[in-house]
Regions:
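Key DNA-contact positions within bacterial/archaeal DNA-binding proteins
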Residues: 209
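Short, Lys/Arg-enriched, Trp-marked, Pro/Gly-tolerant hinge/linker segments that flank
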Residues: 137-146, 156-185, 189-199, 203-204
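Conserved metal-binding segment of the jelly-roll/cupin
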Residues: 55-68, 84
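Generic protein-terminus/edge-of-domain signal
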Residues: 1-56
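Amphipathic, well-ordered alpha-helical segments in soluble domains
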Residues: 35, 121-131, 150, 154-157
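A hydrophobic/aromatic-rich effector-binding and dimerization subdomain
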Residues: 2-6, 74-137
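A short, compositionally biased micro-patch
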Residues: 39-41, 64, 74
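Short beta-strand His + acidic residue motifs that chelate non-heme Fe in jelly-roll/DSBH
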Residues: 45-47, 69-74
Length: 210
């Protein structure tokens, strides 16, 4: 299985382009890192967790660990700002537990269209982080407490964006959504001792094919 992760705790930049995305266009990739992307130019057609989307200018994309993504049609002028956090770093800070309340909503709706004024605020934030990173000798030298602060900013900002879409966060919950919520809760409670698929399937009253 093809996967995507990053070696440093944190990366940030403004130059994800068509050339970059084409590397992930032939086959789906499993995301191991946490990624926050903002489209600032062009458009992209992509599949995220098997659902097809069109990503346009000022769309904010949240990809969490275990998401799958494949890019299809990519405009020549496509460009994204991005921030990424490694799988190792996110595991160490217990990412699943800290995002459990809205992780299912992000998984079902990974793309959030932003108003231009809000998008500009995010662009300013990315630029500030890019500037801060340029002052460090290398990415590997970034203080872990700072990285935790960066991730907290992105997660809190993302949570607020989704709270403003009540038809997503407060709508009728599908069975799939409910199963996913319960699964996340079980993982948080038992992940240190239980690693068997059959255990979680039994707790959810599901047969293994599910």
């Amino acid at each position: 299985m093809l996967t995507f992760d990053i070696t440093n705790d944190f990366i940030v930049g403004d130059r994800i382009t068509k050339e970059t995305l084409n590397k992930y266009s032939k086959l789906p990739h499993k995301i191991k890192a946490g990624l926050f992307l903002l489209c600032v130019e062009g458009s992209v057609q992509a599949s995220i967790n098997l659902a097809k989307y069109t990503i346009n200018k000022y769309d904010f994309v949240t990809l969490v660990p275990s998401n799958f993504i494949q890019f299809h049609e990519i405009s020549d002028d496509a460009r994204f700002y991005f921030a990424g956090f490694s799988s190792e770093f996110m595991t160490n800070i217990n990412f699943i537990k800290s995002t459990m309340s809205f992780l299912p909503v992000i998984t079902e709706h990974p793309i959030m269209p932003l108003e231009e004024s809000v998008a500009q605020l995010y662009i300013d934030g990315y630029r500030l982080l890019i500037r801060a990173q340029s002052l460090s000798p290398s990415y590997s030298m970034v203080n872990k407490n700072l990285v935790i602060a960066y991730l907290t900013i992105f997660m809190q900002g993302t949570a607020e964006l989704y709270k403003n879409h009540s038809h997503w966060t407060n709508g009728i919950r599908t069975r799939t959504n409910e199963i996913y919520r319960k699964f996340i809760q079980l993982v948080v409670e038992h992940y240190t001792t239980e690693h068997s698929v059959s255990f979680y399937a039994a707790q959810l009253n599901l047969s293994l094919p599910h």
